[in-house]
Amino acid sequence: ENKDDFIPDNLSGFYAVSFDPKGKLGWKSNKIIDEDPGYGDAQIIEVLTEQVDGRYLAYLQSMEIPYIFAGEKEIDVKIALEKLKTLMGINSILLEGGSIVNGYFERAGVIDEISLVVAPIVADAEDKPLFMDSTLSEFKLKEIKQYDDVVWMNYIRK
């Protein structure tokens, strides 16, 4: 079944794109409600695969959350980026995914810059890769800065 993208009329122009292949996220609003600077009131956009149940699509429509389809069973990043550009006017994104989403983008070859922050914090969490199932991509150091006890490194694709 070919499913149609859903783009409501009342879009904000400030977006948070969620890659949700199976349609599992239960949003309470169509905007991000977060006290962290830079995220509050961002319009949520769901990127889905065609395997998502019609009931979830009805839920997103009732919440006026835009969604686009990008792949049958797995997210096709290039389709997603093209649709975000043509349907929403989004030309570049800040990727803040976990290792799975980061891996989608890395394997698609669409990451042109990596910004890493090293902070002196010890966490009690299991080790997780930055990119799941990645290919070998090479980047070169563009810039490095120290902010108090934190180091920021900016890399660009070779």
Identify the residue ranges that each predicted region occupies:
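Enzymes that bind and transform nitrogen-containing heteroaromatic metabolites
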Residues: 1-158
